[in-house]
Amino acid sequence: MIKDMIDSIEQFAQTQADFPVYDCLGERRTYGQLKRDSDSIAAFIDSLALLAKSPVLVFGAQTYDMLATFVALTKSGHAYIPVDVHSAPERILAIIEIAKPSLIIAIEEFPLTIEGISLVSLSEIESAKLAEMPYERTHSVKGDDNYYIIFTSGTTGQPKGVQISHDNLLSFTNWMIEDAAFDVPKQPQMLAQPPYSFDLSVMYWAPTLALGGTLFALPKELVADFKQLFTTIAQLPVGIWTSTPSFADMAMLSDDFCQAKMPALTHFYFDGEELTVSTARKLFERFPSAKIINAYGPTEATVALSAIEITREMVDNYTRLPIGYPKPDSPTYIIDEDGKELASGEQGEIIVTGPAVSKGYLNNPEKTAEAFFTFKGQPAYHTGDIGSLTEDNILLYGGRLDFQIKYAGYRIELEDVSQQLNQSPMVASAVAVPRYNKEHKVQNLLAYIVVKDGVKERFDRELELTKAIKASVKDHMMSYMMPSKFLYRDSLPLTPNGKIDIKTLINEVNNR
């Protein structure tokens, strides 16, 4: 059991200073280097005299300097807000407006000019590292202090900043490194694929740093090259694969992704979206000896609240795979619409309680009050997911209560997509709906569009109109939120309350 994340890193800097903590295609950084670099960066950050415990936005990709900066900020007492290099400018602005960071650290070139907030460039971080300044930790992040803040999709088009404390992180990390389902070895060799702005990344970096392992990262140029990406992954000595099931499905398009070509790969950790029977079955065919662990949980409960090893028997007998045994320190309940606890086998909303539950959304008391509450004297969170518990305390997933979905590993609120589409000067009304496959997994996003008067006449074909609408909103939307198909209508169905009847459109798309 670890009691402090930085203490663990510092310990390995003493006992295995030359062991690699980070490897990007053979370019390695050691635990000794991570300590020296993070100490120097922390000293530099202290010299800026920022407001104590104020959050700092860090912009970049899957690089070592991002990791070193995160560690430095933790040492200097600041929560970090990871923002991926591929984020839309409008989203970055929204995050800045909500979070009010005291500083922006741009590991990659920052796409915006922000008044009133200082910006530190990569060259300044490099200069700080070269200074090799010693650092004495007197005010590092601890206890209920925010460790990181990750922004997720919001129902009003505004992202929500989930605050995860040091205590929250310890609850998750200690469970993961001690739980028999994960079976994390000492010095784990982990693939670092999900971006730091996606909390699934915590599932690889937290246990790796806690156990003195190595993170194998991929440069962003390689990630964009599908063929080269999976050829390269097959050559990495990774023992543990952490990703969404969708990314594994992509990997299985490559013949090199198999046990014969990747004998070191023994564990698969999945979270972020539903693991289907077909994906698990294909993985067992490719990696007959591998362990497949299915984890479940919202960002607000610190990455995951349950996990289970998927067996071949489960693949043969379940139509939807179980999502795990709840964490011992995080009692999980099923409640009805009145908040009453339901018995085993009864379906209702999944709620999670205990020390992994976030304190709420940053600077958003209204949304915090809606989602976070107290249950049986413990901090609790409404997941909005439908589920049930078996008599053996295995959690089963039954879908979403609302219109929030998981697609390609990302959590997306349909209203968020609709709001972004409605910003197009050509659109009068728009709504996004998911199309599901037979395994209840989101196959793609579609958009129903009513265009403004005179717009259709400007285009010879609907394809050209679709391209024009996409171009008009691409600077406001994350690419994974863009619907793959646009359906044009003269009007959209309404509920008796005068709202767009999304349920009817979902049923229409899915032939219900």
UniProtKB/Swiss-Prot annotation:
HAMAP family: DltA. Pathway: Cell wall biogenesis; lipoteichoic acid biosynthesis. Catalyzes the first step in the D-alanylation of lipoteichoic acid (LTA), the activation of D-alanine and its transfer onto the D-alanyl carrier protein (Dcp) DltC. In an ATP-dependent two-step reaction, forms a high energy D-alanyl-AMP intermediate, followed by transfer of the D-alanyl residue as a thiol ester to the phosphopantheinyl prosthetic group of the Dcp. D-alanylation of LTA plays an important role in modulating the properties of the cell wall in Gram-positive bacteria, influencing the net charge of the cell wall. It catalyses: holo-[D-alanyl-carrier protein] + D-alanine + ATP = D-alanyl-[D-alanyl-carrier protein] + AMP + diphosphate. GO terms for molecular function: ATP binding; D-alanine [D-alanyl carrier protein] ligase activity. This is D-alanine--D-alanyl carrier protein ligase. It comes from Streptococcus pyogenes serotype M5 (strain Manfredo). It is an enzyme of class 6 (ligase). One of its GO terms (cellular component) is cytoplasm. Coiled coil: none annotated. It is found in: Cytoplasm.
